[in-house]
């Protein structure tokens, strides 16, 4: 885990240094892009950080979910292998209804409610001793996380201050950075404590995501 984390650090730093040299996508936007290249709106930055947190939480399931079930909850290898499949299946189905939910209730309520649901799911993962209930909890977590990232991309693209392509690429860059950095960090902490305690990082990430959702609500007004 630590070696993977150390290997990802130079990539992240290099990407940050080279980001300002990227060419604008459209020639007609060159002048506007030059003026706003270093002025990413706060709403886009908040969306990017929240996407990082959401992707990191999702990544923790793929990287550590099966190992957590088999080593901490003492599930069989076959049952442990079900974790990510169930989580991904629930996420897929939930994202199919994400757009209707956004149209019905609005983008911010979907993000806030999704954060609460995913937090409840992660609490269940850490609390229940029953393997079946842990699987259900992972499903609840996936249900909550599913609509968050697509909604964040949509909100960033509609920021109105920088081109949609620049906004969504910023969100994507930060989001995939979360997949690179956070799951290995959980492994590093698990080496120094245990996997159960290390996964409390995910609970903290979701709590932070909820707090930022409240900030995003103020910025969106």
Which residue stretches match the model-derived regions?
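A membrane-interface helix-boundary motif in multi-pass transporters
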Residues: 1-9, 185-206
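Extracytoplasmic gate region of multi-pass secondary transporters
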Residues: 40-92
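Paired small-residue
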Residues: 121, 132-140
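Hydrophobic/aromatic end-of-helix segments at the C-terminal termini of transmembrane alpha-helices
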Residues: 57-69, 97, 152, 156, ...
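Helix-to-loop junctions at the C-terminal end of transmembrane segments
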Residues: 94-106, 190-191
């Amino acid at each position: 885990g630590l070696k993977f984390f150390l290997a990802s650090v130079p990539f992240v730093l290099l990407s940050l240094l080279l980001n300002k040299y990227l060419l604008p996508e459209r020639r007609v936007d060159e002048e506007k892009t030059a003026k706003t290249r270093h002025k990413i709106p706060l709403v886009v930055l908040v969306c990017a950080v929240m996407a990082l947190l959401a992707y990191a939480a999702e990544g923790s399931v793929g990287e550590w979910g099966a190992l957590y079930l088999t080593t901490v909850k003492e599930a069989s290898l076959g049952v442990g292998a079900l974790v990510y499949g169930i989580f991904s299946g629930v996420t897929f189905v939930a994202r199919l209804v994400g757009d209707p939910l956004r149209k019905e209730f609005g983008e911010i309520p979907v993000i806030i409610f999704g954060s609460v649901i995913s937090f409840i799911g992660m609490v269940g993962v850490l609390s229940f001793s029953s393997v079946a209930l842990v699987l259900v909890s992972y499903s609840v977590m996936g249900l909550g996380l599913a609509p968050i990232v697509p909604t964040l991309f949509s909100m960033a693209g509609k920021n109105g201050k920088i081109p949609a392509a620049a906004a969504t690429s910023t969100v994507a860059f930060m989001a995939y950075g979360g997949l690179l950095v956070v799951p290995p960090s959980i492994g590093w902490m698990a080496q120094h404590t245990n996997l159960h305690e290390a996964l409390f990082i995910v609970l903290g990430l979701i709590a932070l995501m909820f707090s930022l959702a409240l900030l995003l609500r103020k910025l969106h007004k």
